[in-house]
Amino acid sequence: MMFTKALVAATLATLTAALPQPTVVRREGGDAGVTIVNNMDSDVYAWSVTDGVSKMHTLSSGGGSYTENFQANPNGGGVSIKLSTHQDQTDVLQFEYTKSGETIFWDMSCIDMDRAASTFTKNGFDVSPSQTSGDCPAVNCHAGDTSCAEAYLQPKDDHATHGCPIDTSFTLTLGA
C-alpha cells in the first residue's frame, strides 16, 4: 500500500513537471515604458539611442506604433528615442528619459528639428502619462505651434523636464 501511494505521488509529480509552465519574461524597468502612436499621414522612423543606436523601427502612417520598456543606458546617461519622417535621422523629435532610483525623468525635445517645416510641428504631438501630478504632467504641443513651451526648444529649457514614478507608462501620440 505504501509503495502504491509513493508510485502515484511520483507519477503525479512527473506529469505535473511535464505540463507546460507559464513563462514570465521581465524586462528592465518592469512593464513601464513608452508607446509611440503615429496618427499622421506619413510613416515615422524610430531609433532608441543609448551608448549605441538600435535598428530602425517603422511606425506606419495611420496608427502604427512602437513600444519600449524603460531601459538604463550602459554609459550612465539617458536614453533618446529619435523620431523622424526620414530614414536617416534628420529633423528629429525626441522622447528622452533617464531612470533614477524610483523616478523616471523625461522630456520632449524639438532641438534637432526645423520646427517651422517639421511634419511633427504641423501635426502636433502629446504625451499622456498613466498617472499625472504636478511633477508628472501631460504634455501637448498643438498642431502648428512652433514655440511649444512644453518641449525643449533650446538646450537650457530645463523647465520641460518632468519626473514621474518609475512605474509610470507613457503614450506619445504623433498627430494629436
Curated annotation (Swiss-Prot):
Record note on disruption phenotype: No visible phenotype. The double deletion of cetA and calA results in cell wall defects and lyse during germination, leading to the inhibition of germination.
GO CC annotation, single: extracellular region
Inducing or repressing factors: Expression is inhibited by PKA activity and is subject to glucose repression. Expressed primarily in conidia. Expressed and secreted during germination and early growth.
InterPro entries in alphabetical order: CetA-like, Osmotin/thaumatin-like_sf
Signal peptide start-end: 1-18
Alphabetic keyword roster: Cell wall, Disulfide bond, Extracellular matrix, Germination, Secreted, Signal
Predominant subcellular localization, coarse grouping: secreted
Domain of life: Eukaryota
Disulfide-bonded cysteines: 136-164, 141-148
SUPFAM superfamilies: Osmotin, thaumatin-like protein
Localization, UniProt: Secreted; Secreted, Extracellular space, Extracellular matrix; Secreted, Cell wall
Family: Belongs to the thaumatin family.
Purpose of the protein: Secreted thaumatin-like protein that, with calA, plays an essential role in early conidial germination with a possible role in cell wall remodeling.
PANTHER family: DOMAIN PROTEIN, PUTATIVE (AFU_ORTHOLOGUE AFUA_5G01990)-RELATED-RELATED, SECRETED THAUMATIN-LIKE PROTEIN CETA
Name assigned to this protein: Secreted thaumatin-like protein cetA
Organism from which the protein derives: Emericella nidulans (strain FGSC A4 / ATCC 38163 / CBS 112.46 / NRRL 194 / M139) (Aspergillus nidulans)
